[in-house]
């Protein structure tokens, strides 16, 4: 028997939940910033997308580049970084999604690399992962870059040059 809980709106089939709460949120970096070499967290200039986007469900929170989840569940996380290289070729340009399940130790949970063959090049790198959030107080994510030399992480308040997108795809 299919029922809908009057208090929560949860759809049940013989007492088993068959529909999970929906959530989609998207954030971007609004101002470009040059980053030094090595692995560097993207900690500044984050804002929620406000161009042709509508938040679905609950919203993520961000503090110094660390994103906290409002509810438990399984999340698809997609990230992209647009780099501008202005000092020669780069052997690698990395977009890394890091996660923690203890609010302390971060590990790579998604990542991808590209390279730049010259000066004054724009390069887009994207990464994605699935993250099982079982505790909203301890599970968090952040976006990091990795490259030799310097490069500028491109920002924009009009569209998503450097951005992170969260979609809740199911219950944990």
Predicted features along the sequence, with ranges:
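A short, structured loop/turn motif at beta-sheet edges
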Residues: 70-72, 99-104, 132-140
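Self-maturation zones of extracellular/virion spikes and adhesins
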Residues: 6-8, 35, 92, 121-122
């Amino acid at each position: 028997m299919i029922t809908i809980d009057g208090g929560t709106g949860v759809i049940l089939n013989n007492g088993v939940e068959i529909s999970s709460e929906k959530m989609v949120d998207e954030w971007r970096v609004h101002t470009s910033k040059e980053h030094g070499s090595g692995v560097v967290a993207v900690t500044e200039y984050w804002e929620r997308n406000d161009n042709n986007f509508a938040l679905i469900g609950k919203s993520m929170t961000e503090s110094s580049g660390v994103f906290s989840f409002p509810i438990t569940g399984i999340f698809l996380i997609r990230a992209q970084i647009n780099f501008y290289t202005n000092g020669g070729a780069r052997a690698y340009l990395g977009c890394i999604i890091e996660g923690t399940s203890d609010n302390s130790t971060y590990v790579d949970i998604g990542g991808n690399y590209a390279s730049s063959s010259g000066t004054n090049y724009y390069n887009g790198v994207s990464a994605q992962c699935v993250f099982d959030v079982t505790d909203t107080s301890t599970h968090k994510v952040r976006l990091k870059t990795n490259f030799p030399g310097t490069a500028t992480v491109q920002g924009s308040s009009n569209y998503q040059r450097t951005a992170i997108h969260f979609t809740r795809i199911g219950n944990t």
